[in-house]
Amino acid sequence: MRQNFEQIRPMLSDKADLLQVDALEAWTESSFARLQPLLDQRAANGSIRECHGDIHLGNATLLNGDVVLFDCIEFNEPFRLIDIASDAAFLAMDLEDRDLKPLSRRFINAWLEHTGDYAALDLLNFYKAYRALVRAKVSLFRLGQEQQMGL
């Protein structure tokens, strides 16, 4: 996560934006320290698995009434070998980002009922924040590229 903050900061110049990034980084660091025992436990109990790695609405479709995911991250194993709760949190974050919070809650409730992984509840906000941070970083990279191209 630190790498994301290191990459984002140079792309920002507005003092309010930088203060917000500082606050998010402080929250992230304290949350990580608080959650470390649970993260270690999940690593030991098999919750870290090869996952999709990029579950958001742009990588999902309905096919014959079933949700089908596509375009998983195949090019980078560390992006795929993640906590299964991180994969679920990405979709929840994407739904919330699109003002679909009730659908996000329904998804998380169904996911919890299906997996029984209620211990993951303590991690969801942390993982959603991580995924939102990555999305912000990618958006800033794209904006920088567009500005360089004069778009």
Predicted regions and their residues:
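ATP-dependent phospho-/nucleotidyl transfer catalytic cores
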Residues: 1-56, 60-151
